[in-house]
Structures are given as C-alpha cells and as structure tokens.
C-alpha cells in the first residue's frame, strides 16, 4: 500500500508546478457551471484535466472524481484506490491574486465513500511558496514543492499548537443561525480573525497557529456549502491526524458517508475545545 499511495502523492506533487504556472491567462470564466452550480474558471478546468489524466495513468488508481465533474471517471484498468479532488480550491481568489490550493483524498472504496475508507489525504497550497500537507497513518507532514516538482520535508510530524490563536468562518453573517452567531461572538472575543476565502488557506492558518475554521449550515442553506467527499473528509483527516477535531455540528466528519457524489455538509475543524464548544452551542 505504501508504494501505491506514494505514487499518487507524487503525481499531485509533480502536477503542482504545472497548475501554478498555468494560472496566468486563465482568470476568465468558462460558459459552464460545475455540478454544484458554481461558475468555472478556465483555471478550474485546466487543473482538473491535468489531475484526471495523470492520476488515472497510475496503476493503483481505479477511479477519479472531482468537484468539477458530474460523475466518477473510471480507469481503463481497475486499481485499488479511488481519488477525490478539488483541483483548485479557492479559485475565486484568482482574480484578486490570493491564496488557492489543490485538495485530494485517497479512498480504498469506490466513490462516493465513507470517511473511514479514506487512507490518505492532502493539499497543495499555492501561497508565496508552494507547500504540501499530507495526512497518512495518523501523521501529518509538511513539505515544500520546488519549481521542478521536487519536494523537501520541512515538518515530519505536524501538530496543532495547544494555544489557539486564529479563527475564520464562511457564509454571509445575516444568514448565520442565531445559535451559530452566538458561538462566533464568544470565539471572536478570544481569537484573531483570519479569513481569506479559500478553505485550504484558512485551514492552513489553523494548522499553523491553532484555532478553529468552519463553514456552517445557513438559514437559507442548512446543508452548508462545502462538499463532504472532496473537502470535508480530506480536511477532517488532516486536522484530526494533527491532533485536532472535525465536526458537522454533531460529530466527526469522518463518520459520515455521502449518499451522493457532490453532497454538501457543514464543516468545522480546529482545536478540540472549540469544536466541543461548537457542538454544545448548536441545537
């Protein structure tokens, strides 16, 4: 299993410089929307097509699914693992030249799969430098990806700081439920606001400084915005492996199994104390 997972991660790593280099000139919208009803940038489609072609070329990969596609794409030869990806998380930040990333989860069951079928997860963060966070076998590792696609481990056992510093929550404030708004008010009196509009960037702040990030169920969208398979499970696996917690407001995201490929979920991750307080605050 180890070699096969390494092969999958290596493809994501080697693709990262191509995704980053390809952002220039792809800041305009396509005519189409993705399956979640969001407008697609040319950069979304470009990153998705690169990952699909390269991951399905790995012998161990049996299928590929992404936030940008309606259905699962099967490999010609059935491999053991199934990859779910958000090829360009935070792509709406491209116009303003802010943080984006590539998020992926490796499952050992056909998609859509339950959180306990996830065997590895990770994300590439396109910031001032390009970094990779991976979670596997209960350990989180941080690496730097160079322009030629090589990676160098900089932290081999990343854990959440025990003294939380930052918080960030998505969704329009007028659409927050009263219970969630009250919770945020208490958090805001203790932590510093850090919210950049790309989940990967905001979660990376939490991993670096400790704290809490979430995108809640809203008054007009109780199911939330983020996708369980493409975003919820992988981010939950990373934060939990780093010693934190995840929740949909009721329990760990890794205990949830989507019935549909693009199923949405409220999402909260961070230090245990803030996730416990969140679950106690929500009805």
Curated annotation (Swiss-Prot):
Predominant location category: cytoplasm
Q: Which InterPro entries match?
A: FBPase_C_dom, FBPase_class-1, FBPase_N, FBPtase, Fructose_bisphosphatase_AS
Residues that coordinate or bind Mg(2+) 2: 86, 89, 231
The protein's name is: Fructose-1,6-bisphosphatase class 1
Similarity remark: Belongs to the FBPase class 1 family.
Instruction: Establish whether keyword Metal-binding is in the entry.
Output: yes
Keywords noted in UniProt: Carbohydrate metabolism, Cytoplasm, Hydrolase, Magnesium, Metal-binding
Q: In which pathway does it act?
A: Carbohydrate biosynthesis; gluconeogenesis
Q: Which residues take part in binding Mg(2+) 1? A: 67, 86, 88
**Catalytic reactions on record:** beta-D-fructose 1,6-bisphosphate + H2O = beta-D-fructose 6-phosphate + phosphate
Q: Which GO terms describe its biological process?
A: fructose 1,6-bisphosphate metabolic process; fructose 6-phosphate metabolic process; fructose metabolic process; gluconeogenesis; sucrose biosynthetic process
Main enzyme class: hydrolase
Task: Give the multimer and partner information.
Answer: Homotetramer.
> Cross-referenced SUPFAM superfamilies, in alphabetical order?
Carbohydrate phosphatase (SSF56655)
Q: Where in the cell is it found?
A: Cytoplasm
Give GO terms: molecular function aspect only: fructose 1,6-bisphosphate 1-phosphatase activity; magnesium ion binding
Q: Name one GO cellular component term.
A: cytoplasm
């Amino acid at each position: 299993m180890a070699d096969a997972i390494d092969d999958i991660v290596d493809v994501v790593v080697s693709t990262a410089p191509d995704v980053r280099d390809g952002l220039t000139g792809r800041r305009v919208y396509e005519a189409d929307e993705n399956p979640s009803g969001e407008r697609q940038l040319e950069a979304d489609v470009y990153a998705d097509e690169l990952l699909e072609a390269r991951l399905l070329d790995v012998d161990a990969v049996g299928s590929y699914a992404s936030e940008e596609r309606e259905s699962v794409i099967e490999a010609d030869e059935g491999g053991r693992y199934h990859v779910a990806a958000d090829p360009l998380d935070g792509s709406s930040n491209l116009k303003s030249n802010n943080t984006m990333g590539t998020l992926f989860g490796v499952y050992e069951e056909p998609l859509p799969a339950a959180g306990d079928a996830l065997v590895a997860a990770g994300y590439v963060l396109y910031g001032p430098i390009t970094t990779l966070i991976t979670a596997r076998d209960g350990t989180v590792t941080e690496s730097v990806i160079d322009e030629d696609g090589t990676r160098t481990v900089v932290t081999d056992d990343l854990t959440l700081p025990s003294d939380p510093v930052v918080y960030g929550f998505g969704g329009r404030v007028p659409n927050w439920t009263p219970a969630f708004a009250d919770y945020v008010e208490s958090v805001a009196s203790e932590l510093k606001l850090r919210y950049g509009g790309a989940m990967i960037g905001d979660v990376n702040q939490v991993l670096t400084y400790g704290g809490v990030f979430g995108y809640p169920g809203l008054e007009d969208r109780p199911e939330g915005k983020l996708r369980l398979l493409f975003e919820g499970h992988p981010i939950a696996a990373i934060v939990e492996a780093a010693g934190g917690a995840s929740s949909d407001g009721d329990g760990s995201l890794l205990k949830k199994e989507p019935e549909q490929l693009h199923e949405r979920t409220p999402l909260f991750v961070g230090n245990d104390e803030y996730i416990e307080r969140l679950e106690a605050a929500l009805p």
